[in-house]
Amino acid sequence: IGMSPNVRKGRTYDDLDYDYLSKTLDISAISFHKAIQVARRKDAINDWGSIVALSYIAAQRTLYGYNDMADAKALLESIARSFGYIYGREKHVRINTVSQSPTPTTAGSGVLGLGDLMEFAENMSPLGNASAEDCADYVLTLFSDLTRKVTMQNLYHDGGFSSMGMSRRAMKTYEKGLRFDDVHQNQYPFGDGEK
């Protein structure tokens, strides 16, 4: 579950409503802690079981417009590590997070520039963006015995986006933009054309 009232209300990161931020953290990260805590107290997960949450690269890198959801995802990943140690030592329960490619979701629909981000990630990723279905298939492996020794990790499922600096496809897009700027530079005598 992930949701930010600040994003939904169009609040920028430098103008957060702190009550909304508290709700963002509670819904998008602390709820994960609560669920694991209850499962542990009730002994609801078998030995060598697995818990997986979805994160996003904005937990570690600045992505303009992702807003306070980046803070929530960073907290989510920290919870996975901290509880991963405790639950792992007790019952060998594995806890991981998966950072997925930008994917159109209800929660993501409020993120400023999501369509542009998806296009950028597609151009940057050697394998292209991973679909929601691809992500579901990947997460299934984390519930299998094939990943019995994988825990406390944030695992990237993003077509290679997280390891890229610049791709040829993305550079070509920038070159087109730069050529456009060169041709039209006289239209904006006082700057770069941003209003």
What are the residue ranges of the model-derived segments?
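Catalytic loop of short-chain dehydrogenase/reductase
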Residues: 3-90, 99-104, 128, 161
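Short, small/polar-rich loop/turn modules that mediate ligand/substrate recognition or access, typified
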Residues: 48, 92-94, 150-152
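Non-catalytic terminal and boundary segments that flank Rossmann-like NAD(P)-dependent oxidoreductase
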Residues: 6-7, 19, 168-195
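Generic structural signal for alpha-helix termini and adjacent loop/cap motifs
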Residues: 38, 42, 144-148, 166
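Phosphate-coordinating loops and pocket residues in cytosolic domains that bind phosphorylated ligands
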Residues: 15, 26, 110, 123, ...
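Short, flexible, mixed-charge acidic loops at enzyme active sites
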Residues: 10-13, 110-115, 168-175
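C-terminal helical subdomain
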Residues: 30, 97, 115-150, 155-159, ...
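Short beta-loop-alpha junction of Rossmann-like oxidoreductase domains
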Residues: 90, 101-113, 166
